[in-house]
């Protein structure tokens, strides 16, 4: 019996000693922010339904882990967790928070390998601590001046992201293994959010720019903001109610006097009258009905933005195109007036001129019409991608070159030739019309938006066309001149490649869906000729081949303009100079993922590129800057 007791005692002491020597499984990361930050849980709610949702969900979760890692870096100088047991414990803690939000109980195991958060000497240039960072890169880097504050401003965020990629490049050079680029980028993000940014990892600066976390609503870090917003809202509501009441009174007093007539029209016979303050002609509806044969099907020539377009002939013999505006989700009286006011004051040879307009109100609906000069050669899209049995000769290289330059000049005028600048927001083939000489003119300013100098727009209503929308605008409503540059880049690629912006017929690699990814991958692989429209590579009737070097330059400018990062796109003026050969085209940059990109996921062997990067749905990581 004594021997049995001694054996049990020794066994107990042995097990106690083993537990004491085993690594601690207590997680040092605080995940309380998972419940306080208004992050968008939509993709995580349906992560089991599509690969895209899963990738977006995993991206959000990676950011939620990155926030406390940045906090810990500042507190302990350690970039990652000490061992596998700690990493597993932290992922379990995160999963507990996610489950409390009624999300799936296996999200962390679905998205992560615990090893990816454990530090080791081979992660990135042997860096484990901030001391290692300083010893490798020096006491300061480009991040220190670019990422310290003010990152909610798009321009400053651009500069910070560009600095991040420069530092990443330094780290990859030091490491010597380009496959570690993703890990190095995560280190850059963690350092910028935890050490450099003055407001910290949970600030608006870090969440909106560094981590690019998709939020349900803007962050308000102080209760005072809520109070002020509530007070302003109540005041605005009261004022709005008074204004509406006044308008109702005016309507009942004066409404009958104008009901059923053209707005802004004075009955002075059949001659059109110049409307004050705009310079555009206001037609009577009877004139437009006569010109278009009562908007007959025979005169119908296509559908443009927000309406149907009819060909017409005025009494003086001039041919016009009349757009009959139809009500839609985006268009109303305010936007119609906006279009008239903007277009009527624009005069440039590469813009479609507005001849006039008409607006009729009756009991059932408002009818609005825009009158343009008729462009006899239709739109660019019809020439690039003929429909049905229509046969058109492929555009020649001189024609393609001329069209690209014309569009660039038209956009340069909108961005720099008028004050305030105008952003078109819907540059695409169907909005580029061709006159009798095949010169291009930018059309359809129904979505145009004026800008105050030096400003970027933030809007909750994104307008435009899928495949041409700049990612930062499509995802976050951040509108700048570079948004038009992105769309212009896509149009260049369509012209040079003879391929649609979104090619849904393509099978195989998801990289082939988007023309931007497809063209970039071929050019980076040294297969530029495979990206060019085949008709451009054949010799013309004269026996002379097209200038391959110039065509490649145009293709490279298109890729550069359509880069997912705002900071790496040129302005339209610089793009025009590159096209004309006045300045050199910089080397085509990689399409690097922004800070914490959803397209990277872990498989059994390490990080791989996810098909979501080039899928039809663009996610928060695809865009930034």
UniProtKB/Swiss-Prot annotation:
Segments on the Extracellular side according to the record's topology features: 21-227
Membrane topology annotation: Single-pass type I membrane protein
MF term (GO), any: ATP binding
Subcellular location, principal: membrane
Keywords: ATP-binding, Glycoprotein, Kinase, Membrane, Nucleotide-binding, Receptor, Serine/threonine-protein kinase, Signal, Transferase, Transmembrane, Transmembrane helix
Transmembrane segments: 228-248
Location of the protein in the cell: Membrane
EC supergroup of this enzyme: transferase
Active-site residues, as the UniProt record annotates them: 426
Residues bearing glycans: 40, 106, 121, 177
Entries under SUPFAM superfamilies matching the protein: Protein kinase-like (PK-like)
Reactions that this protein is recorded to catalyse: L-seryl-[protein] + ATP = O-phospho-L-seryl-[protein] + ADP + H(+); L-threonyl-[protein] + ATP = O-phospho-L-threonyl-[protein] + ADP + H(+)
Binding site for ATP: 301-309, 323
GO annotation, cellular component aspect: membrane
Membrane recorded as keyword: yes
Ranges of residues in domain Protein kinase: 295-555
Range of residues in the leader sequence: 1-20
Enzyme Commission number(s) of this protein: 2.7.11.1
Protein name: Probable receptor-like protein kinase At1g11050
Organism, as annotated: Arabidopsis thaliana
Source taxonomy: Eukaryota, Viridiplantae, Streptophyta, Embryophyta, Tracheophyta
